[in-house]
């Protein structure tokens, strides 16, 4: 049986071999066809767009704020000529989800200092009402030293803010907006109130706003001049008629804000740019600036420059170019520069060597241990007593502390007292490290960010100008030694 099985196996093997030979030409022709098909020349994919490497030089047609200097009529007739309230009804009718998604795509980050993504923040508001109304609160309590951008919007382009309130309110499902204006801003309030009356008379606000079927009210509240009310929860407390002291979080305002209702607090500039973004498209807005730092921005430059100004420019513009293009350069030339505070008094200063190349956006300034903040650029030339300047800021934060948190209430006082002694060199070298330690005990240990704002300028001074502090201490010690010997 074994030979028979062997013969049968051999026959089976021969038949399989013959069958394979019969199929091989067909397989070869199929593989050849496939190969010829696969090797057919395909058009090359389009090259990726070149990565943008230079920022700045914003064209006039790309500016959102076209009446920043008050050269034109700030009220309704002039505003409509400049494009405000153009087909606002169509934007409203596109709905809440569309507005929020477009804002997310634009890459807009909050212009009040924190830089939180605006579309994401708006989306935190409840999607389904539990019976409580939702509110938009606009933080116009612009009190940061060096910051003067929002007042230009309220004074010269108030309808941009009012239209933005409606658009943002629809995006948040809010029934009303409260604009909280700094107490000292009298002219700004008068212009904004007149613009509000015009908008109501024209049917742009109130019942059936812009004929869209959406009811939206706008209220204007005058503050009393307290810096702490620029903190969002302190602002809500003040709006409710209480002392302006920050609240503990959670609950966050999006869950329990004004009068215990869902609330979003946002900056004047953030709200004012939203209608233009929706009209021109998020892709247009995100084409400016670096990734994650999109759009245009209002920069207010003051201090030792030839022409202080507030100007709208592209995000990520080099700091040096911003000053030389729009302010006529540093007083006495760039080589006369000592240091710059790039984002209002709450951020650490940066010395001249960093200012040479740094870009004006959130990420670039964070990388050099500073921040964009409100984009209030304070320029100090070599005539500045930098220690005295930071000591003066320390006094400001001591004066404006609400006193609720012990680290801030006590720490800001100690910062100011030590800085006053450092100013005249009346200290010991080891006290510089003690001063640094005091800032660390304040930073991150308070309910709101005022403690951080008080600590960071002092930390920046120690980081970049420690030799100056040491020089003053040594020189005073030498003088006292000589006086004692005499």
From Swiss-Prot:
Residues 1-30 form a transit peptide. GO terms for cellular component: mitochondrial inner membrane; mitochondrion; plasma membrane. Residues 31-40 have a biased composition (Low complexity). One of its GO terms (molecular function) is FMN binding. It catalyses: a ubiquinone + NADH + 5 H(+)(in) = a ubiquinol + NAD(+) + 4 H(+)(out). NADH binds at residues 110-119. It is found in: Mitochondrion inner membrane. Binds 1 FMN. Binds 1 [4Fe-4S] cluster. It is a peripheral membrane protein. Residues 31-57 are annotated as: Disordered. Its EC number is 7.1.1.2. InterPro entries: ComplexI_51kDa_subunit, NADH-UbQ_OxRdtase_51kDa_CS, NADH-UbQ_OxRdtase_suF, Nuo51_FMN-bd, Nuo51_FMN-bd_sf, Nuop51_4Fe4S-bd, Nuop51_4Fe4S-bd_sf, SLBB_dom. Its cofactor is FMN; [4Fe-4S] cluster. [4Fe-4S] cluster binds at residues 402, 405, 408, 448. Residues 41-50 have a biased composition (Pro residues). Core subunit of the mitochondrial membrane respiratory chain NADH dehydrogenase (Complex I) that is believed to belong to the minimal assembly required for catalysis. Complex I functions in the transfer of electrons from NADH to the respiratory chain. The immediate electron acceptor for the enzyme is believed to be ubiquinone. Belongs to the complex I 51 kDa subunit family. This is NADH dehydrogenase [ubiquinone] flavoprotein 1, mitochondrial. It comes from Arabidopsis thaliana (Mouse-ear cress).
